[in-house]
């Protein structure tokens, strides 16, 4: 397990970034579930209209190969296979006229689909 806290992000380059907005929303969702053991897992899998797709789920388990990014007391988990597709990406939470959703801004994505949940490299 590789853990990077928000404080360490100033000295250690985290594999991806977790915005204040995303951390706040995850914290709110965890409080609604009344389970402080939950962490947000972000992963990449094959599929979608562009070849790869992003996924989000809550998980209580931190696997040995997980990268852990901690911010505002919230932990974001990324497995070692997915992290290679997410290097330098930003996980954000946005609310606008179309609704509210977690958004990944990924500099490694050569193209993305219109929905923003799948990409190609």
Curated annotation (Swiss-Prot):
GO BP term (any one): iron-sulfur cluster assembly
Sites where the protein binds iron-sulfur cluster: 49, 113, 115
Cofactor or coenzyme needed: iron-sulfur cluster
Molecular-function annotations in GO: 2 iron, 2 sulfur cluster binding; 4 iron, 4 sulfur cluster binding; iron ion binding
Listed Pfam families: Fe-S_biosyn
Record key words, sorted: Iron, Iron-sulfur, Metal-binding
Protein's UniProt keywords contain Translocase: no
InterPro entries, alphabetized: FeS_biogenesis, FeS_cluster_insertion, FeS_cluster_insertion_RrpA, HesB-like_dom_sf
Record's keyword annotation contains Signal: no
Cofactor note: Binds 1 iron-sulfur cluster per subunit.
NCBIfam families: iron-sulfur cluster assembly accessory protein, PRK13623.1
UniProt similarity note: Belongs to the HesB/IscA family.
Annotated function: Required for insertion of 4Fe-4S clusters.
Assembly information from the UniProt record: Homodimer.
Protein name, entry field: Putative iron-sulfur cluster insertion protein ErpA
Gene it is expressed from: erpA
């Amino acid at each position: 397990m590789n853990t990077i806290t928000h404080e360490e992000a100033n000295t250690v380059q985290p594999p991806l970034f977790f915005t204040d907005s995303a951390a706040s929303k995850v914290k709110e969702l965890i409080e609604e579930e009344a389970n402080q053991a939950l962490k947000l897992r972000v992963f990449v899998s094959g599929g979608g209209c562009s070849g790869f797709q992003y996924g989000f789920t809550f998980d209580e388990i931190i696997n040995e190969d997980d990268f852990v990014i901690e911010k505002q007391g919230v932990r974001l988990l990324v497995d070692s296979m997915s992290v290679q597709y997410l290097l330098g990406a930003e996980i954000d939470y946005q609310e606008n006229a179309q609704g509210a959703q977690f958004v990944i801004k990924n500099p490694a994505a050569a193209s993305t689909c219109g929905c923003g949940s799948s990409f190609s490299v």
